Swiss-Prot record:
Species whose genome carries this gene: Pseudomonas syringae pv. syringae (strain B728a)
Function comment: Catalyzes the reversible cyclization of carbamoyl aspartate to dihydroorotate.
Top EC class of this enzyme: hydrolase
Keywords: Hydrolase, Metal-binding, Pyrimidine biosynthesis, Zinc
Active site: 248
Protein name: Dihydroorotase
Amino acid sequence: MSDRLTLLRPDDWHIHLRDGAVLPHTVADVARTFGRAIIMPNLVPPVRNAQQADAYRQRILAARPATSRFEPLMVLYLTDQTTPDDIRTAKASGFVYAAKLYPAGATTNSDSGVTSIDKIFPALEAMADVGMLLLVHGEVTRGEIDVFDREKVFIDEHLRRVVERFPSLKVVFEHITTGEAVQFVNEASANVAATITAHHLLYNRNHMLVGGIRPHFYCLPILKRNTHQTALLDAATSGSGKFFLGTDSAPHAQHAKENACGCAGCYTAYAAIELYAEAFEQRNALDKLEGFASLHGPAFYGLPANQDTITLVRDEWTAPASLPFGELTVIPLRAGETLRWRLEEHA
């Protein structure tokens, strides 16, 4: 077994960078490893049009480390009021690559999200026409639906209908967490793919709930039982081009996580590819990591793969106990614990 692993530089097809004073920290962490990233638009207020996307993009570019060539790929936030013209203008911009469906109330800053899928059908039709991807947070939000069942119910009630109604629309089912989601993506057309996070590959709900509640494992969609974790590992390491890397790295300040009503999100960008390497190594599938991390995503988006490389070294190191987050701190996933792979830094 080799102690070095060289990959084409990967991309992150789902990340939250937040905004304002934290950007120099979050952008530096993602740019350290990834060539490009799909930037989530759930700011306050959300990124609803091309003009707002461009302004956010400029703030991200301004926060890059001096020598970085990291490229943010922007996303529109779909609302009940999104028009076909909004979609066409965004597509014509050249820097908006997708639009994001957040069911209203499903996750952080989703209150402005879609209240009924039918209300965005004109926008979805325009997206299919111009070749803009639909990114989906796939959970229903009705109070009577158990939080562990919300992904499966979303597939049955909404996602099947969208895929059938718009067969030419490319759809990314984001941060999938269940065996049912894996099966849906595998059985769907070539226009349907999914991202998988490192934390859903490495952990299940026992890690969050057994022996005490561990708030830094709390995310949405929530960690599921170990049988679903196994299905995700099977999918990620299968070599199928339908599955690719999306960290859903989602920082919240320490006080907002360690709270009587803590926020959902795991901060993994500081060591994302290292965490994925651990998951793939558990399956003796390090040979499949480059496809998952560096090739499948660009192919689905119709973009070229990166041409430069990164190198991972089998070398244990201790994750920081905390990281700067503007004037506050964020507790990263695996804080203070040992990681088995290290990204080789080049002078």
